[in-house]
Amino acid sequence: MSEVNEETLRAREALAGHYKEVLGLLGEDVEREGLLKTPERVAKAMQFLTKGYHEDPEAVLRSAMFQEEDYKQMVIVKDIDFFSLCEHHMLPFFGKAHVAYIPKKYITGLSKIPRVVDIFARRLQIQERMTMQIKDCIQRTLDPLGVMVVIEAQHMCMQMRGVEKQNSLTTTSDFTGFFQQAKTREEFMNLIKHNR
């Protein structure tokens, strides 16, 4: 278990004070038993849910980057579960990311792709930007022949409030290089279909 540094603890304490104030402004009795530790719990949870601000996704990819000049086909990591927070309402959105790249000179450890997804998801986000950030990070770091990212997500800000559409699913995609060719994109989309 990693140690929590002083700066993190100070920030957590300040956040907890603000959350206590929010609870009071909502009309709650902040001294009732069930809420006594809630501000600290929420502060700790928010630090975890936004820890991606303090992590370097390019360093994660570089930590397991290997030269491989022979393999020139798609590498796909699909059905990567993620949770994020919408920057507009700070409500969760969650779903699956599907990521592919076509190596030119380098490959990366397979576990590094989900880690990159998590780093960008653990920030206040919008799905469209998260899709682009994952694509751009892989393209910049591995310099492959192409990258494609598809994200499918449910947004609690659409399900719990607003239009209240509980079964809606939002899909975003972005791509570079060889994935600009319709045939390559079609191959990727066929490979990530959920026909198990």
Curated annotation (Swiss-Prot):
Any single biological process term in GO: tetrahydrofolate biosynthetic process
Record note on quaternary structure: Toroid-shaped homodecamer, composed of two pentamers of five dimers.
EC annotation from Swiss-Prot or TrEMBL: 3.5.4.16
Pfam family for this entry, one: GTP_cyclohydroI
GTP-binding keyword on record: yes
Keywords annotated in UniProt: GTP-binding, Hydrolase, Metal-binding, Nucleotide-binding, One-carbon metabolism, Zinc
This protein's name: GTP cyclohydrolase 1
SS bond list: none
Underlying gene: folE
Catalyses which reaction(s): GTP + H2O = 7,8-dihydroneopterin 3'-triphosphate + formate + H(+)
GO cellular component annotations of the record: cytoplasm
GO molecular function terms listed in the Swiss-Prot or TrEMBL record: GTP binding; GTP cyclohydrolase I activity; zinc ion binding
Upper taxonomic lineage: Bacteria, Pseudomonadati, Bacteroidota, Bacteroidia, Bacteroidales
Binding site for Zn(2+): C86, H89, C157
Family: Belongs to the GTP cyclohydrolase I family.
Pathway as given in its UniProt record: Cofactor biosynthesis; 7,8-dihydroneopterin triphosphate biosynthesis; 7,8-dihydroneopterin triphosphate from GTP: step 1/1
